[in-house]
Amino acid sequence: MVELSKKVTGKLDKTTPGIQIWRIENMEMVPVPTKSYGNFYEGDCYVLLSTRKTGSGFSYNIHYWLGKNSSQDEQGAAAIYTTQMDEYLGSVAVQHREVQGHESETFRAYFKQGLIYKQGGVASGMKHVETNTYNVQRLLHVKGKKNVVAAEVEMSWKSFNLGDVFLLDLGQLIIQWNGPESNRAERLRAMTLAKDIRDRERAGRAKVGVVEGENEAASPELMQALTHVLGEKKNIKAATPDEQVHQALNSALKLYHVSDASGNLVIQEVAIRPLTQDMLQHEDCYILDQAGLKIFVWKGKNANKEEKQQAMSRALGFIKAKNYLASTSVETENDGSESAVFRQLFQKWTVPNQTSGLGKTHTVGKVAKVEQVKFDATTMHVKPEVAAQQKMVDDGSGEAEVWRVENQELVPVEKRWLGHFYGGDCYLVLYTYYVGPKVNRIIYIWQGRHASTDELAASAYQAVFLDQKYNNEPVQVRVTMGKEPAHLMAIFKGKMVVYENGSSRAGGTEPASSTRLFHVHGTNEYNTKAFEVPVRAASLNSNDVFVLKTPSSCYLWYGKGCSGDEREMGKMVADIISKTEKPVVAEGQEPPEFWVALGGKTSYANSKRLQEENPSVPPRLFECSNKTGRFLATEIVDFTQDDLDENDVYLLDTWDQIFFWIGKGANESEKEAAAETAQEYLRSHPGSRDLDTPIIVVKQGFEPPTFTGWFMAWDPLCWSDRKSYDELKAELGDNASIGQLVSGLTSKNEVFTATTTLVPTKLETFPLDVLVNTAAEDLPRGVDPSRKENHLSDEDFKAVFGMTRSAFANLPLWKQQNLKKEKGLF
């Protein structure tokens, strides 16, 4: 029997928020390199551990993923390892069985850029590699609107259909072909995946080109490459509809008591919807069947060990006995550590330290200490780099160097500005830490929401340059404003401040007399930051701490629902924002000048639910649709404001009220049916909801604070600043450089490699003085005015630019153009 080895438990990190992934290789668990996260071989099985910080402790989700071509032995090993890992963690984890192509939304949400299925597996010698691999030739079929899944398919036009998006990956060139019937959201998600492959696997050096299926004639070079690789285009198949599940099926619930008396599986129905928590006896194990769409296994804390260990295998036996699909999702719950998804299936559910219903047990006069999670070097030196999305490799006490991008170059940030990040800037943070004698580095590329396109491009280029300086060894982490990972916050020890606009460069900061409001979020020095929000009362939230800086004072405002930990961190970060004395203002006891500074007192997010530190039913966001004539709701896990697409409608369920958010581009029938759709949601909810629950219809741009309060750092200008699909497509680069790559491809019979020439043929050379500062009309016949540099001899080229042609070709386009202008060859 397989057992969780000390090699695995020794490296397993129980206190770092993020994910860790292992592949089953020869029946052993082998860590997957961080840069390969999101890539899964169809012939293999994987185990994924997700760790989250919850209050004073941690919650865990363990998923075992089964590739469609994996062996029964590997599948069994993955299941056993999952059970053993749960026991190692104290039997508090939620276990999930994931089957390729049928993964849960929770699993897919770990990979925001997309999930890629790769052909082969460990048995055929397939390895998870790091970056800079150009010897690639594959066709990816991309599906999904929110959480994208891409599968490797046969390199043929037969694989295409009119309704989906496909990526032809040729190493240095990635071609995105958009089916004529695919929508903008699908095209945008596929483009994000293509960019992620370019940046994560090719260090930003590959080119991405897009072909619109309804207008292929507009991209002749890319179509030339497609036909060169795939052959002459054949008739494309019709669109295949995405699998959709009727909400009514989700609401069909049956609870079973399962035992294997006399060696036979005995299934006894206990109850149907509505279900209540007291139906679950602590001495037993149960199966909750959600109409065959998903199976939940609940293990009572006092059930015998054998029953607990057999829970997953019993669920699989139940699926077989019911003739359900083998791909049916299975989730295993431990008594007292149930997932929110499981709890919301019951009409009534209470957790320890909470009163029944929506009330909250509050402790008066108790001040919580700032919790310190131990990531000291003594503990960490025996652990390799933790496979976690948030890169929490240590306690942040290593050496950090910070630069700001200025005029496309790096300028060191003064010590007094460390931890201050301005929305008009881009920054590079080089973090150095040691594991024993070995030096390790992480490069964080922080990109402000209002930084220029040139600065965004320069930050990526400078990161590659810095990476090369250290032999391509550092881990690169791109951080968009508002999505700062825990380790980046830990580097600044809870003193990270993010400003909406402005710059820390000379003359770029706003006057010290300006009034600013900061939303402080975090409970310890590893997860705290202050985020600037609009200076108005509506920005406040009863659940958090805020810092209001005025020309004459600086207020520290404590909402009624904030914890002692949050108050302590609020004090710490406030000292960074202002050196003046900070009067503490408790919610409800604000002096008149406080409201004057905010432009007057108005309503803000202050509902009783917001004051609960640990609500038993967390808010849930669903993307809604009635396009098929029936109500469909797709849950968005770990939602943020960025998940709200202005062309769609969404339902935010906070249990005691339902919000229906309507984007400006939503269709008329969805707008008209808003209240009715929300009522249908309540009627079909498996938890037998109160049909009198208030339903609030919210229009984009007119959101009340009771809605925005459920989103971290709500930005009213979010959609006006958001780039369109066409704008993002235009940023991919010019067609000339792609044309050169296509010429290089079609003139050869081989796949692109890192050494593929970017110039298709040898052009006629001319003396330097004939080309420099010469107008197009005065150039000799045969000279391409846009490519003067390619008419230089190799010696002249190196003398002028101080580098070889290949080094020049690896520079970003803006850098190439600047050099050409400087040398008179533009």
Swiss-Prot record:
GO terms for molecular function: actin filament binding; calcium ion binding; cysteine-type endopeptidase inhibitor activity involved in apoptotic process; lysophosphatidic acid binding; phosphatidylinositol-4,5-bisphosphate binding; protein homodimerization activity. Residues 129-137 are annotated as: Crucial for binding an actin filament. Residues 735-826 are annotated as: Headpiece. Changing K145A: Reduces the actin-severing activity. Does not affect actin-capping activity. InterPro entries: ADF-H/Gelsolin-like_dom_sf, Gelsolin-like_dom, Gelsolin-like_dom_sf, Villin/Gelsolin, Villin_headpiece, Villin_headpiece_dom_sf. Residues 820-823 are annotated as: Absolutely required for activity. This is Villin-1. Consists of a large core fragment in the N-terminal portion and a small headpiece (HP) in the C-terminal portion. The core fragment is necessary for both actin-nucleating and -severing activities, whereas the HP binds F-actin strongly in both the presence and absence of calcium and is necessary in actin-bundling activity. The Gelsolin-like 1 repeat is necessary for the actin-capping activity. The entire core fragment is necessary for the actin-severing activity. Residues 760-826 form the HP domain. The keyword Ion transport does not apply. Gelsolin-like repeats lie at residues 27-76, 148-188, 265-309, 408-457, 528-568, 631-672. Belongs to the villin/gelsolin family. One of its GO terms (cellular component) is actin filament bundle. Monomer. Homodimer. Associates with F-actin; the association with F-actin is inhibited by tropomyosin. It is found in: Cytoplasm, Cytoskeleton; Cell projection, Microvillus; Cell projection, Lamellipodium; Cell projection, Ruffle. Epithelial cell-specific Ca(2+)-regulated actin-modifying protein that modulates the reorganization of microvillar actin filaments. Plays a role in the actin nucleation, actin filament bundle assembly, actin filament capping and severing. Binds phosphatidylinositol 4,5-bisphosphate (PIP2) and lysophosphatidic acid (LPA); binds LPA with higher affinity than PIP2. Binding to LPA increases its phosphorylation by SRC and inhibits all actin-modifying activities. Binding to PIP2 inhibits actin-capping and -severing activities but enhances actin-bundling activity. GO terms for biological process: actin filament capping; actin filament depolymerization; actin filament polymerization; actin filament severing; actin polymerization or depolymerization; barbed-end actin filament capping; cellular response to epidermal growth factor stimulus; cellular response to hepatocyte growth factor stimulus. Specifically expressed in epithelial cells. Component of brush border microvilli. It holds the Pfam family VHP. Residues 1-734 are annotated as: Core. It comes from Gallus gallus (Chicken). Changing G144A: Reduces the actin-severing activity. Does not affect actin-capping activity. It comes from the Eukaryota. A 1,2-diacyl-sn-glycero-3-phospho-(1D-myo-inositol-4,5-bisphosphate) binds at residues 112-119, 138-146.
